[in-house]
Amino acid sequence: MAGHTYGATTTAAEIVAHVRLQRRRVVVTGASSGIGVETARALASTGAEVTLAVRNLEAGRQVANEIADELPPGPGELQVARLDLADPASVAEFVRAWSGPLHILDNNAGVMALPRLTRTPAGYEMQFATNHLGHFALSTGLHRWLAAANGARVVSVASIGHLFSPVVFDDLHYRFRPYDQWTSYGQSKSANVLFAVGGAQRWADDGVTVNALMPGNVATTALARHLGADDLANFGQETDLALPPVKTIEQGAATSVLLAVSPDVEGVTGRYYEDCVEAPVVDERAGHTGGVAPYVLDQENADRLWQISEALIR
């Protein structure tokens, strides 16, 4: 990267240290806990207008107040808006309420490894519906405002978990196969990367870049709230993956913030990053602590998922 050397221990604050985004508008989903809070904090420190898109308005307002108290007086502004990604009506209302250019959309919210098969009222498996379909509906719904920004960036927070499973197009919602919390999570994270690949190709002429990332192994995030001690202890045995070294929340938010604001990735699109650099392609998952699978970079898979997703959110 030109001018900077970033890595696994880089923090979000280091990424934005010399970045100024006055009069830029930002949306961060899931910004009431974990990495989402730190992402919002870092982006707000640049002077941007940051909207915290959250399920729990009270929690979101508390976070916004805490961030505002930490920042020096300046042009930055924090807003809080309700968004439940598993509820199509909530997503549609958020989209309807938005007006004007959107410069950065950080699709950060998610659920992880739900222990039991749960479906939305429409019959969609909950991890796929929340992690992918909700963000897909949000992003496509806001597309005209992203295009209006003349150089917008969309950031899709994925995971090493995409190595657990590709998108199983013939049974997205576990109607014909036994439910597994890890393959379900993996499928949704694979979809997050394929969204970036598909969006990059479709939105290039609008000046919109779309990239995906692995934030890292952040033990203090609320993402793993559904997991018990045994689930975490058996992680490697059940998934054939080795956990990467633990990061702080500040380090975990860094790659997302890099893709959102860094001049070093200007024009980069359709890529998958980890530890603030583009991830290497890996063909086998066993023993890996990182890397990206070929099936999530495949344009045909991305196109197929895009078409299916459009049909599912109608």
Segments (PLM) and residue ranges:
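Pocket-edge positions in alpha/beta enzyme catalytic cores
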Residues: 52, 83, 244, 294-297
